[in-house]
Swiss-Prot record:
Modified residues (Phenylalanine amide): 94, 125
Identification of the protein by name: Pro-FMRFamide-related neuropeptide VF
GO biological process: negative regulation of gonadotropin secretion; neuropeptide signaling pathway
Keywords for the protein's UniProt record, in alphabetical order: Amidation, Cleavage on pair of basic residues, Neuropeptide, Secreted, Signal
Subcellular location: Secreted
Superkingdom, natural source: Eukaryota
Family: Belongs to the FARP (FMRFamide related peptide) family.
A Gene Ontology term for the protein's cellular component: extracellular space
Tissues/organs with expression: Isoform 1 is expressed at high levels in the hypothalamus and eye. Isoform 2 is specifically expressed in a region between the dorsomedial hypothalamic and ventromedial hypothalamic nuclei.
Region of interest (Disordered), residue spans: 161-186
Signal sequence annotation: 1-26
Primary location recorded for the protein, binned into one broad class: secreted
MF annotations from Gene Ontology: neuropeptide activity; signaling receptor binding
Organism expressing this protein natively: Rattus norvegicus (Rat)
Gene: Npvf
Length: 203
């Protein structure tokens, strides 16, 4: 019994001593860079410090007061009715009036510019024009042009082109989109039938 208890006692003392020494060594290692940095900072401060010929002087309260008064920014109130030049190109919600700023020539140029941007839009936003319709339909055989689907396709596409050219007449938006989607589906069907028809004409 005495042998077991002495072994336990020895193990306990070894464990505690190793634990305590590791803690003290770790804390010493953590503190060492701190001391070194303070010493290095002191040396650096002495090297980079104030030159010998220059003396430090204290700032008086009056100088601080004068310095603070110079730093105040004087703001003048802006005139209420004047619109700054930088606001000339802002949208209407920022106070620019389209009737005052734009001439009829500028308005016509703007409309022409928006019409020229239509070819980059997808088909359901009005990309197809009458020229494109005639080009696509000219490539189809004559028999398929007389069919009901191609005539409906031609009608839907020309009607869509007329709606783009005359935006003053308001059409129900949902109806225009459904007609355009139907026209796209019919055009895809005709495009799928075109190789078959060409093969039949060769025979």
């Amino acid at each position: 019994m005495e042998i077991i208890s002495s072994k336990r006692f020895i193990l306990l003392t070894l464990a505690t001593s190793s634990f305590l020494t590791s803690n003290t060594l770790c804390s010493d290692e953590l503190m060492m860079p701190h001391f070194h940095s303070k010493e290095g900072y002191g040396k650096y401060y002495q090297l980079r410090g104030i030159p010998k010929g220059v003396k430090e002087r204290s700032v008086t309260f009056q100088e601080l007061k004068d310095w603070g008064a110079k730093k105040d920014i004087k703001m003048s109130p802006a005139p209420a009715n004047k619109v700054p030049h930088s606001a000339a190109n802002l949208p209407l919600r920022f106070g620019r009036n389209i009737e005052d700023r734009r001439s009829p020539r500028a308005r016509a140029n703007m409309e022409a510019g928006t019409m020229s941007h239509f070819p980059s839009l997808p088909q359901r936003f009005g990309r197809t024009t009458a020229r494109r319709i005639t080009k696509t339909l000219a490539g189809l055989p004559q028999k398929s042009l007389h069919s009901l689907a191609s005539s409906e396709l031609l009608y839907a596409m020309t009607r869509q082109h007329q709606e783009i050219q005359s935006p003053g007449q308001e059409q129900p938006r949902k109806r225009v989109f459904t007609e355009t989607d139907d026209a796209e589906r019919k055009q895809e069907k005709i495009g799928n039938l075109q190789p078959v028809l060409q093969g039949a004409m060769k025979l």
